[in-house]
């Protein structure tokens, strides 16, 4: 179950609850952003959403939901559905961005994200040092 908790300067945060026991499974914070693409001597920024934080309790990280999906896949799918809904109903954007820790890159690739191409410019925030910039195209 996805529950909206709060909105602040970081973005909007949602918490995932296990409905069988009320335990918090994980959380996600997303916000408005932009994807910068370089073109010769110029760059263009395209509207995007950014998943700033996506964390899952260790007991659920590799736990299967059923034979086909893991809890982590279903939770990310819920976030993507919510962002697609926002794009269609409120703020139009074509990309969802995130900065992945190296050990989670395969998880995001399995769920449709790609690493930035050579023409995409990453942000220079300190908290993303060592993280891999990735994008999902709507």
Regions found by a protein language model. Give the residues of each.
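Non-catalytic substrate-recognition and accessory regions of acyl/acetyltransferase enzymes
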Residues: 1-66, 74, 78-96, 101-138
